[in-house]
Regions:
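Positively charged n-region of N-terminal signal peptides that target proteins for export
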Residues: 1-2
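A structural "domain/chain start" motif
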Residues: 5, 10-54, 153, 157-164
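Surface-exposed short loop/turn segments
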Residues: 59, 67-138
Length: 164
């Protein structure tokens, strides 16, 4: 009985860290991709992309074309003009190259650089919500702003000297 209590307490202490903690360390440049599904509004998409660029650039993170790591913002909208509520999903993910542990140790042993890189998710956060059709764009924009703020906050936690 005592062993179970000790094991539970020990596992809770060790599992409190966020899985993406320190994954944004030394991140200085990214590419940006915006995917909108459910609404075809090129002007709004362009406005969102410009907003995202400005939010990232104001923190001195350089945006390059066709670069890895890639910051992907996925927006899925179900706009119901018939029903009172519409639904949306906004996801922000950072993808970069990685290598499996087995291949890493093999490349060290062989002193060769491996070419078997994988694309992995290094950071991810998302929001699901509901809104009226009249407030849908505004609520999606608020959600995007909240996710970008979370990303920037984590970036500063992983790169504390960038604040100065």
């Amino acid at each position: 009985y005592f062993f179970l209590i000790f094991l539970t307490a020990f596992s809770e202490i060790n599992s409190k860290d966020i899985w993406y903690e320190k994954n944004l360390k030394d991140l200085e440049d990214i590419s940006l991709e915006l995917n909108v599904v459910g609404i075809k509004d090129d002007v709004w998409e362009s406005r969102l992309y410009n907003f995202l660029e400005l939010r990232i650039l104001e923190h001195d993170i350089v945006i390059l074309k066709n670069q890895i790591p890639k910051l992907v913002i996925d927006i899925n909208i179900i706009d119901s003009r018939v029903e009172k509520t519409s639904s949306f999903f906004v996801g922000l993910s950072l993808y970069s190259y990685s290598i499996s542990e087995k291949m890493y140790y093999k490349s060290i042993a062989d002193t060769l650089i491996t070419k078997k890189l994988m694309t992995s998710k290094f950071f991810s956060t998302e929001i699901m919500g509901q809104s009226s059709s009249n407030n849908l764009y505004r609520d999606v924009e608020k959600s995007i702003n909240r996710l970008v703020s979370n990303f920037i906050d984590q970036w500063y936690q992983d790169n504390p000297l960038k604040q100065f």
